[in-house]
């Protein structure tokens, strides 16, 4: 019994990469399910004004951990697709971009196979996820005064840690959205994107200093996620710790599905917040643009 328990908590090898691992069977039994908490998306007067939402996905699956192993990750499908479902039903179409223009990488082991809402929005946007735009190629349009985008959405999943927080393109985009009073939507590990405006800047000039957010707790990444074999080793760096160093205030200590709006920044704490954040984002954008 003890040996079976230990084995089920051992990360599963991913043979597509040297020394790479998926989450353990036990961790997936705790963290994933066939259905989400989706309970409807009722937007009787959807937006029809033409503004869209730009979703920035991760184009990298592997994170090099402190012990030399590779974590096989990507974007979490629920964190991406449930907010997309709500916003799409509210009338906001999505464009999809990655840093390289290569396909968005999803944690398919977390896909809720019996959730019709998630499956339907995945099918609708699969062509864009497989062939996204390169962020640099649409950046000038995205930051322009007549930008077609009402908001930018950065879903979570540990894959966000690879590239997006260090991207000069993401830095310019977020700075422009702040300056032009547009919306930024992100959850779980997605708020790692908020580190981009600090690239090559003095900490005292950080534009999100004093903002309150929800984000996946560092304590889980340094504790339970290692203990149950969700990750094969310690992360190279921690999202919350680095945001707090820059003056961001983290509201949540656990993962309960908490969401929060601070000015034009909408955040959620974990996959459990996906449905709530989708509702908050849809309601917020409809109030702002459906006039």
From Swiss-Prot:
Q: Which reaction does it catalyse?
A: N(omega)-(1-hydroxy-2-oxopropyl)-L-arginyl-[protein] + H2O = lactate + L-arginyl-[protein] + H(+); N(6)-(1-hydroxy-2-oxopropyl)-L-lysyl-[protein] + H2O = lactate + L-lysyl-[protein] + H(+); S-(1-hydroxy-2-oxopropyl)-L-cysteinyl-[protein] + H2O = lactate + L-cysteinyl-[protein] + H(+); N(omega)-(1-hydroxy-2-oxoethyl)-L-arginyl-[protein] + H2O = L-arginyl-[protein] + glycolate + H(+)
Q: Where is this region: Disordered?
A: 1-24
Asked if the keyword Protein biosynthesis belongs to this entry, the reply reads no
InterPro entries annotated for this entry? Class_I_gatase-like, DJ-1/PfpI, HchA, Prot/Nucl_acid_deglycase
Q: Where is the composition biased (Basic and acidic residues)?
A: 1-18
Q: Which residues form the active site?
A: 188 (nucleophile)
Q: Principal localization?
A: cytoplasm
**What keywords is this UniProt entry annotated with?**
Cytoplasm, DNA damage, DNA repair, Hydrolase, Stress response
Which EC number(s) does UniProt give? 3.1.2.-, 3.5.1.-, 3.5.1.124
Q: Name one GO cellular component term.
A: cytoplasm
Biological process, per Gene Ontology: DNA repair; methylglyoxal catabolic process to D-lactate via S-lactoyl-glutathione; protein repair
What does the record give under GO molecular function?
A: glyoxalase III activity; protein deglycase activity; thiolester hydrolase activity
List the SUPFAM superfamilies hit by this protein, alphabetically.
Class I glutamine amidotransferase-like
Q: What sort of enzyme, by top EC class, is this?
A: hydrolase
Q: Where is the protein situated, by its record's location annotation?
A: Cytoplasm
What Pfam families does this protein's entry cite? Answer: DJ-1_PfpI (PF01965)
Query: Where does this protein have coiled-coil stretches?
Result: none
Membership in a protein family:
Belongs to the peptidase C56 family. HchA subfamily.
Q: Which HAMAP family is this protein grouped with?
A: Deglycase_HchA
Q: What does this protein do?
A: Protein and nucleotide deglycase that catalyzes the deglycation of the Maillard adducts formed between amino groups of proteins or nucleotides and reactive carbonyl groups of glyoxals. Thus, functions as a protein deglycase that repairs methylglyoxal- and glyoxal-glycated proteins, and releases repaired proteins and lactate or glycolate, respectively. Deglycates cysteine, arginine and lysine residues in proteins, and thus reactivates these proteins by reversing glycation by glyoxals.
- Its recorded name reads Protein/nucleic acid deglycase HchA
What is the species listed in this Swiss-Prot or TrEMBL entry? Pseudomonas aeruginosa (strain UCBPP-PA14)
Give the organism's phylogenetic lineage. Bacteria, Pseudomonadati, Pseudomonadota, Gammaproteobacteria, Pseudomonadales
Q: Which gene encodes it?
A: hchA
